[in-house]
């Protein structure tokens, strides 16, 4: 799903080249099938059933994201959701609790949509995440604002002139 949201946000206000525009248009196929069939596909997968819904999800994850990655410039497919994942890899809890890339990125998408003030879309994804057990809070990925790496980064952000230290209660 991140390919769609990162791609559309990162390319906003640009006049994309033809290849980029194709990838941006195709990026909806990285999110729409997951939101439409994801819950059923998870149940089917857990029951070891190959169904059209599960096939749609597999194709969205493997084929659609592959096409988008190949069509658009790298700056369009790297954004806040993946930056958050990269940052969380330094937390011992990420490895200790075996949090998967997609779990952490799904939380990052929520944060990214909030930062972009896309509240209605964020709320739609929030409901989806809850429906299939994906993270919706820092605690769901066993991260705490007071964890030393997060505390250090909050301090750096607050001293860089970029604004006040984020409140832990807002995370």
Regions found by a protein language model. Give the residues of each.
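C-terminal charged capping/lid subdomain of soluble metabolic enzymes
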Residues: 118-171
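Short, surface-exposed linear patches
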Residues: 1-4, 101, 161
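Active-site segments that bind and position negatively charged phosphate/pyrophosphate groups
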Residues: 16-128
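Charged, low-complexity surface segments at secondary-structure and domain boundaries
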Residues: 13-15, 43, 135-140
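Conserved anion/nucleotide-ligand pocket segment
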Residues: 1-13
């Amino acid at each position: 799903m991140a390919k769609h949201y990162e791609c559309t946000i990162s390319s906003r206000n640009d006049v994309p080249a033809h290849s980029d525009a194709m990838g941006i248009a195709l990026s909806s196929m990285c999110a729409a099938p997951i939101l439409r069939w994801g819950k059923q596909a998870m149940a089917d997968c857990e029951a070891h059933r190959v169904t059209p819904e599960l096939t749609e999800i597999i194709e969205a994850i493997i084929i659609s994201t592959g096409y988008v990655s190949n069509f658009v410039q790298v700056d369009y497919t790297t954004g806040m959701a993946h930056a958050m994942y990269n940052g969380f890899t330094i937390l011992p809890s990420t490895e200790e609790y075996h949090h998967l890339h997609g779990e952490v990125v799904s939380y990052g998408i929520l944060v990214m949509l909030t930062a972009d003030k896309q509240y209605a879309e964020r709320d739609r994804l929030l409901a989806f995440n809850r429906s299939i057990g994906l993270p919706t809070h820092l605690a769901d990925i066993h991260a705490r604002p007071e964890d030393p790496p997060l505390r250090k980064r909050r301090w750096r952000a607050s001293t860089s002139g970029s604004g006040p230290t984020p409140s832990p209660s807002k995370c």
